[in-house]
């Protein structure tokens, strides 16, 4: 846990999933402080929109203004709810919207934590363009190293005149005034042909590797299991290419597509609808934090290409949680398959959790591993 003192309220905040005491990661950053310093309670008029509030620092601080928290991360929503409870703030004070929803009209203040991908930022700025006015105060913040010329040009192109502040605690702010510049329409998704198939893969703005098949998934697809039955999971499904391939290779199985990103789940659904519509009745689509709340002993197999970062921070906490959830939800003799960068040494992590691990394939960059749930080992 970490403490954030600001002009609105003193907060105790924690990350979600929680980090361990040996390698603690803070649930807020200097950019959050810097953004809050720009606001005065008496100056806030109209709806407050907060975009990409990773762990709820801004939403908790401004809770009395009934802000809208907008983003593409269910984990961020869970983190914000947990931090609201931790600080004794009514959860209903914050309204949650995903990035594809319609934003509230004529906001008084818009606070943006600059996301990792320009594609998501552009999608969000285009959505804001439909609702902001010249009187809306628009401020974005990030680590100074994460604000580039391309970031500023995007604000200018979509919204209007843009300036930056001096760096403070290695954070920088962007101030933008809306003046409705001329702007061509843009497609909601980026599409490309998947080599070796007749499939066209559609990707919403925040999908990992949205402009082409990432090399980890390419390697994984060469070693996926075949002729499985029952329910199998594409965990952290992204655009759903792994799940699509599983549907093709396992015609007797049902595939559950799971991701914490609403845009990823929407992309997976779209890709099944457009490429294998006849398989829709063998699919389930789930926005979730890994397999939280899913009953134990349900699945025959779980397949996963786990992330090793959360927002801008490198961490294996998300992967560790995925592995534990997979073990809980697998049937006895159910199998977990993962692909990962070799340097992450997930072999020993899986062996610790499952009591076994087998290397299925390896190259100079990636490894495909399999672990089997052998019993009720804790």
Curated annotation (Swiss-Prot):
One of its GO terms (biological process) is rRNA base methylation. The keyword Transcription regulation does not apply. GO terms for cellular component: cytoplasm. It is found in: Cytoplasm. Its EC number is 2.1.1.174. InterPro entries: DNA_methylase_N6_adenine_CS, rRNA_m2G-MeTrfase_RlmG, RsmC/RlmG, SAM-dependent_MTases_sf, Small_mtfrase_dom. Belongs to the methyltransferase superfamily. RlmG family. Specifically methylates the guanine in position 1835 (m2G1835) of 23S rRNA. PANTHER family: RIBOSOMAL RNA LARGE SUBUNIT METHYLTRANSFERASE G, RIBOSOMAL RNA SMALL SUBUNIT METHYLTRANSFERASE C. This is Ribosomal RNA large subunit methyltransferase G. The gene is rlmG.
């Amino acid at each position: 846990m970490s403490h954030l003192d600001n002009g609105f309220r003193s907060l105790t905040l924690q990350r979600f999933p929680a980090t361990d005491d040996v390698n603690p990661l803070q649930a807020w950053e200097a950019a959050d402080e810097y953004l809050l310093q720009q606001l005065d309670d008496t100056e806030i008029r109209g709806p407050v929109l907060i975009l990409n509030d990773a762990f709820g620092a801004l939403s908790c601080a401004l809770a009395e203004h009934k802000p809208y928290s907008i983003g593409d991360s269910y984990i961020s929503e869970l983190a914000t709810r947990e931090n609201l409870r931790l600080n004794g703030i009514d959860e209903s004070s914050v309204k949650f919207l995903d990035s594809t929803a319609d934003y509230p009209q004529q906001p008084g203040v818009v606070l943006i934590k600059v996301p990792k991908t320009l594609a998501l930022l552009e999608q969000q700025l285009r959505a804001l363009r439909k609702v902001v006015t010249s009187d809306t105060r628009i401020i974005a913040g990030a680590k100074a190293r994460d604000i580039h010329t391309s970031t500023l040009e995007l604000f200018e192109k979509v919204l209007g005149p843009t300036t930056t502040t001096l760096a403070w605690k290695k954070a920088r702010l962007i101030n933008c005034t809306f003046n409705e510049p001329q702007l061509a329409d843009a497609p909601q998704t980026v599409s490309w042909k998947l080599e070796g198939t007749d499939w066209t893969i559609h990707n919403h703005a925040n999908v990992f590797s949205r402009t082409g098949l990432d090399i980890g998934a390419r390697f994984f697809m060469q070693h996926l299991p075949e002729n499985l039955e029952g329910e199998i999971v594409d965990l952290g499904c992204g655009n759903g290419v792994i799940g699509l391939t599983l549907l093709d290779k396992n015609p007797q199985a049902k595939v559950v597509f799971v991701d914490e990103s609403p845009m990823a789940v929407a992309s997976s659904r779209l890709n099944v609808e457009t490429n294998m519509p006849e398989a829709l009745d063998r699919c389930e689509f789930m926005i979730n934090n890994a397999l939280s709340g899913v009953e134990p002993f349900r699945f025959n197999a779980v397949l996963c290409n786990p992330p090793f970062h959360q927002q801008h921070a490198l961490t294996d906490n998300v992967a560790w949680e995925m592995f534990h959830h997979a073990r809980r939800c697998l049937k006895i003799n159910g199998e977990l398959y993962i692909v990962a960068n070799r340097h992450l040494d997930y072999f020993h992590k899986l062996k610790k959790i499952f009591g076994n691990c087998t290397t299925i394939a390896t190259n100079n960059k990636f490894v495909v591993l399999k672990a089997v749930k052998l019993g009720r080992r804790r």
